[in-house]
């Protein structure tokens, strides 16, 4: 007869991209794929499901914490941009300001929110910021299954424009389209994620430039599917826009608008699990060709205890 145990968690989200955060720094927690899937399931009455499950372990090197990341399908992945901001805010609430977060995709320096009581304040200085790893564009670093000298124009589907490929801690394909992005991720995301050129799969981003430094973005996350927002997707899209010259942006600042941002514009009064609360539902990315930083809102939803 198998034994059950309870495990404490905190439910958080970054622009609707939601997480179950388990702090295992004092009491070790090792979850199998089936347990991850159970906690992430949308019909789980305790957690309400999640896109990613984040387990915090003692650091492996010189950081403050090691963040283990699982997608809803039980697969372990290297990076999660929104999740990193959530963990930065979580640790700041416990007294660790500007924590250093280790991940499989690299070590992240953070700038924790100045006011943890108001993570959704209108002043972006109060929102967690993450200094991301240097983007990698070499075909072996992404990685791609075939050697390609130019990874900025990779054909993944005959009906779509070429993709800009980049690794920002995890692999991404960014496809710019002229008109709106609505429906494209749902239509093509799963097929492109499994493309033969992508031995480890990839997150798939459909982007459209809609303003001087504004990019509309829809993302299909590897192992999670459609997502309300993707932090690493926002970073990958800013990198692509910079190198492809999509935006004449002398400040190297990009405002990335995920689906929830468009929903907010349509309904200013909307408030779902603390996602908006009056702040801009955008991810702000700064990229100068080398250094990459992303900043955006996160929210605490509730604390709970699940039985495994």
What are these regions (language model features)?
Residues 163, 171-174:
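Selected transmembrane alpha-helices and immediately adjacent juxtamembrane segments
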Residues 136-138, 146, 152, 174, ...:
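A generic alpha-helix propensity feature with a strong bias for hydrophobic helices
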Residues 127-135:
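Membrane helix-loop-helix hairpins that form the core translocation module of multi-pass transporters
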Residues 138, 145-151, 156-158, 166, ...:
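C-terminal domain-closing interface element
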Residues 1-125, 174-308:
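A glycine-rich beta-to-alpha transition motif near the start of alpha/beta enzyme domains, typified by
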Residues 1-28, 130, 142-166:
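N-terminal, positively charged, Ser/Thr/Ala/Gly-biased leader segments
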């Amino acid at each position: 007869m198998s034994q059950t145990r309870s495990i404490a968690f905190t439910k958080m989200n970054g622009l609707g991209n939601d997480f179950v955060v388990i702090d295992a720094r004092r009491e070790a927690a090792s979850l199998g794929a089936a347990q991850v899937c159970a906690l992430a399931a949308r019909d789980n009455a305790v957690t309400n499901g999640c896109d990613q499950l984040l387990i915090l372990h003692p650091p492996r090197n010189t950081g403050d914490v090691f963040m283990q990341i699982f997608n809803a399908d039980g697969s372990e992945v290297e990076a999660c941009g929104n999740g990193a901001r959530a963990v930065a805010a979580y640790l700041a609430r416990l007294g660790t300001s500007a924590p250093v977060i280790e991940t499989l995709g690299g070590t992240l320096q953070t700038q924790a929110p100045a006011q943890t009581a108001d993570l959704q304040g209108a002043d972006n200085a109060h929102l967690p910021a993450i200094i991301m790893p240097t983007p990698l564009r070499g075909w072996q670093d992404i990685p791609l299954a075939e050697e390609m000298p130019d990874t900025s124009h990779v054909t993944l589907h005959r009906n779509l424009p070429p993709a800009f490929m980049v690794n920002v801690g995890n692999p991404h394909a960014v496809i710019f389209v002229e008109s709106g992005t609505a429906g494209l991720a749902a239509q093509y995301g799963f097929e492109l994620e499994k493309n033969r050129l992508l031995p480890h799969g990839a997150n798939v981003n459909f982007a459209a430039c809609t303003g001087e430094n504004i990019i509309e973005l829809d993302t299909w996350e590897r192992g999670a599917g459609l997502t309300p927002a993707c932090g690493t997707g926002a970073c990958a899209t800013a990198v692509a826009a910079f190198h492809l010259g999509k935006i004449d942006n002398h400040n190297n600042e990009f405002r990335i608008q995920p689906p929830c941002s468009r929903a907010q514009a349509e309904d200013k009064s909307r408030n779902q699990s603390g996602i908006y609360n009056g702040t801009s539902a955008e991810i702000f990315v700064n990229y100068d060709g080398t250094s990459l930083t992303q900043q955006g809102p996160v929210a605490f939803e509730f604390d709970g205890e699940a039985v495994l």
